[in-house]
């Protein structure tokens, strides 16, 4: 299913993002002077299952999760430098059941162990001065996308 996700908004997914699902987030532009840009994968109960915070000013990408009214867990960080290539950066997230696999522009994968074992029902996109276009497209499907009709 294809969604158009505008900055400072979220989309409710038609079907849960669950194990064996893939979400491909694609931007039509890259703002090299952009600031902190965040994508959150949210459960139906609004728990943040996967928090991806891209912070170019700190040269870091942070991964985390938290219960709706809980505290953030320990941050997991990787360097930001050279993760995105203009003009059309992308982020791909694969749910493997016990962990998420995250790829930036089809580069090396990062693995984030799930701390909250729920399915995502929505994806949120937040920024004041986004690195990416508004909207971004979000394509959510199974590991093998359905074949077109014959």
UniProtKB/Swiss-Prot annotation:
SUPFAM superfamilies: Concanavalin A-like lectins/glucanases
Keywords, ordered alphabetically: Cell wall, Extracellular matrix, Fruiting body, Lectin, Membrane, Secreted
Cellular component terms (Gene Ontology): endomembrane system; extracellular region; membrane
CDD domains, A to Z: GLECT
Compartment(s) of residence: Secreted, Extracellular space, Extracellular matrix; Secreted, Cell wall; Endomembrane system
InterPro entries (alphabetical): ConA-like_dom_sf (IPR013320), Galectin_CRD (IPR001079)
Binding site for a carbohydrate: 51, 55, 64, 75, 77
Keyword Glycoprotein: no
Assembly notes: Homotetramer. Oligomerization is required for carbohydrate binding.
Role this protein plays: Binds lactose. May play a role in fruiting body formation. Displays toxicity towards the nematode C.elegans by binding to a specific Gal-beta-1,4-Fuc-alpha-1,6 modification of N-glycan cores on C.elegans intestinal cells.
Listed name of the protein: Galectin-2
This protein's encoding gene: Cgl2
């Amino acid at each position: 299913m294809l969604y158009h996700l505008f900055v400072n908004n979220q989309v409710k997914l038609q079907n849960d993002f669950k194990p064996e699902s893939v979400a491909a987030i694609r931007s039509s532009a890259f703002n090299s002077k952009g600031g902190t840009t965040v994508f959150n994968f949210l459960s139906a109960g609004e728990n943040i299952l996967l928090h991806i915070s891209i912070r170019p000013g700190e040269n870091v990408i942070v991964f985390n999760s938290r219960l709706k009214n809980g505290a953030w867990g320990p941050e997991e960080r990787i360097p930001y430098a050279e993760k995105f290539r203009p003009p059309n950066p992308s982020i791909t997230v694969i749910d493997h059941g016990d962990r998420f696999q995250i790829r930036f522009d089809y580069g090396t994968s990062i693995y984030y162990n799930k701390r909250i074992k729920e399915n995502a029902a929505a994806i949120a996109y937040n920024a004041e001065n986004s690195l990416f276009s508004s909207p971004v497209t979000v394509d959510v499907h199974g590991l093998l996308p359905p074949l077109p009709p014959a």
